[in-house]
Amino acid sequence: MQSHYPASFERDMACTEAEWLAWLPKAMGEHDWQRAGQAVDVQLQGGGQLHIEWKPLPPRTIALMRLPRLGMAFRFDGADDQARTQFMRRFDLTTQRGGG
């Protein structure tokens, strides 16, 4: 988990698209959201919006291990630092796997 989340950032997630879609409802929590293809628009309860887009990436290979990857792009609009942090902390806890 980070201490600061900028208004726009990208990250890789070690999951398949099917896994991500299964996590999506819980990761959104109480916020209203709508999916359109490989994107989701989220209406944040404290005001502001979040747009997330994803695309499958080639797997990450470490020795004999292959990890699936999704490229994720996050864009907050009209959300202050507190609203971004509050949403992303829940999101990160919900999607965290292993010891990471």
Predicted regions and their residues:
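Short, conserved charged micro-motifs
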Residues: 17-22, 80-86
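A common structural junction motif
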Residues: 28-29, 91-99
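A general secondary-structure signal for short beta-strands and their flanking turns/coil
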Residues: 2-8, 47, 67-69
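Intrinsically disordered, low-complexity regulatory segments
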Residues: 34-51
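A short, structured beta-strand/loop element
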Residues: 47-63
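Short beta-strand-to-loop capping motifs
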Residues: 11-15, 44, 74-79
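Terminal, regulation- and interaction-focused segments at domain boundaries
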Residues: 1-31
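Intrinsically disordered, low-complexity regulatory segments enriched in Ser/Thr/Pro
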Residues: 58-79
